[in-house]
């Protein structure tokens, strides 16, 4: 996925050939990675590295990004193929972890809690040619059933390559598992793949935590047949059906993974940009109920319609209130899809750091929520006299967000405050 672009998740099963030559890497030992920091609480918040990140930035930028990410240890997620990583197994049994080694080394050096997403798959597992990579279709094609065992074997090889990684998500957004003949998700095919990967990972290390199904959950503003709806829209029942099939037929799981956007497919954010976020809480509650309170992970979330024209202040305010919704609904992990761009691009909307390494507003938001609202911290009810000022609090700290495009004065937690348009303000409470 890419920032603000939430479409085209239903890949095809087409045959494909060609693409660039994918060479096996030189034989080299696995990197020696520092273990993740020991923390009292699971951080809950984190980032997914995408095509461009700090590991392939100029050294000064990389060092600044390392400091931004590491000041409060975050979850840091990386895919095994695509999104900054080359083909990990260009031909059967021939591996190339060059980019993946570099990315995982950066995560370790920036005190990240490492997470790996097991997607995508080498071409030869999907009907393509061994030794070549067709990147144009990489993200849209699933492994063929006869290669499910090969993909599970690759997953196990990667788990052995990075023994400090204890959390794995299986596949991404059901890519390639849309069945156009039945007009629904092929949950049966995905779950068969998932179960093979689950078994393979657990054989490597029983402490490895495995999650799926990583289904994209879309909504429409128009009503339709669905067991889950609200003022924010109607959930596509086919996504819920796929999730329930996986819950019933999985071999096992340590957490359940989904992703989604506040935007409906037919009308953008409804009823408005801030109220639309209630979708995330409603889906999280549904998941916890259906999966017997299994930890819920949001692998991606999106809140901004294309061509929104939002200022960075509004963008960050909407993200802040979204994170409030995640915390209130009991989400265990929420991974921000970091939209870093190639060096030299001056404007990087929603990025964690700028092209020159300077931190962007999203960085402080992630650090603040990770420090004050990790898993296990008890939330406290705090009143705001003006509904436009949203607040999330624990015993020692609260965060306020002005959702209006004008100054708002309100009494929050017994104190009068004036917030500028879309301002986010942290305030100590001196308790606990």
Predicted regions located by residue number:
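C-terminal region of N-terminal signal peptides and the immediate post-cleavage residues
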Residues: 2-27
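N-terminal substrate-binding region of glycoside hydrolase catalytic domains
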Residues: 25-157, 163-170, 174-181, 215
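Noncatalytic carbohydrate-binding groove/subsite architecture in carbohydrate-active enzymes
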Residues: 186-318
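C-terminal beta-strand-rich structural cap/linker in extracellular carbohydrate-active enzymes
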Residues: 417-432
């Amino acid at each position: 996925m890419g920032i603000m672009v939430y479409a085209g998740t239903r890949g095809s099963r087409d045959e494909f050939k060609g693409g660039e030559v994918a060479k096996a890497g030189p034989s080299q030992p696995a990197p020696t990675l520092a273990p993740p920091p020991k923390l009292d609480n699971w951080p809950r918040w984190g980032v997914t590295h995408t095509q461009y990140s700090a590991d392939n930035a100029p050294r000064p930028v990389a060092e600044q990004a390392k400091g931004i990410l590491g000041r409060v240890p975050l979850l840091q997620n990386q895919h095994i193929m695509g999104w900054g990583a080359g083909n990990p197994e260009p031909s059967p049994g021939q591996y190339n972890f060059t980019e993946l080694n570099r990315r995982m080394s950066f995560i370790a050096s920036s005190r990240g809690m490492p997470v790996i997403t097991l997607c995508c798959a080498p071409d030869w597992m999907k009907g393509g040619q061994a030794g070549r990579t067709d990147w144009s279709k990489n993200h849209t094609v699933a492994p063929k059933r006869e290669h499910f065992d090969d993909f599970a074997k690759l997953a196990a090889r990667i788990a052995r390559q990075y023994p400090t990684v204890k959390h794995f998500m299986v596949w991404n957004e059901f890519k390639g598992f849309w069945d156009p003949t039945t007009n629904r998700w092929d949950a049966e095919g995905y779950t068969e793949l998932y179960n093979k990967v689950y078994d393979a990972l657990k054989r490597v290390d029983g402490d490895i935590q495995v999650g799926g199904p990583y289904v994209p959950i879309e909504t429409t503003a128009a009503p339709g047949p669905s067991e889950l709806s609200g003022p924010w829209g109607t959930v596509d029942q086919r996504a819920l059906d796929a999730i329930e099939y996986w819950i019933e037929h999985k071999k096992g799981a340590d957490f359940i993974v989904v992703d989604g956007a506040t935007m409906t497919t037919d009308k953008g954010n409804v009823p408005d940009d801030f109220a639309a976020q209630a979708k995330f809480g409603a889906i999280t509650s549904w998941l916890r109920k259906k999966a017997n309170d299994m930890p819920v992970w949001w692998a991606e979330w999106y809140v901004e319609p294309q061509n929104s024209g939002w200022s960075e202040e509004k963008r960050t305010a909407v993200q802040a209130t979204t994170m409030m919704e995640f915390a209130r609904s009991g989400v265990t992990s929420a991974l921000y899809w970091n939209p870093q761009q190639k060096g030299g691009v001056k404007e990087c909307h929603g990025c964690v750091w700028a092209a020159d390494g300077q931190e962007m507003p999203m960085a402080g938001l992630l650090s603040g929520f990770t420090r004050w609202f990790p898993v296990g911290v008890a939330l406290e009810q705090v009143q705001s006299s003006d509904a436009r000022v949203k607040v999330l609090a624990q015993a020692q700290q609260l965060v306020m967000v002005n959702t209006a495009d004008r100054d708002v004065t309100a009494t929050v937690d017994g104190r009068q405050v004036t917030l500028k348009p879309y301002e986010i303000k942290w305030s100590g409470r001196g308790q606990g």
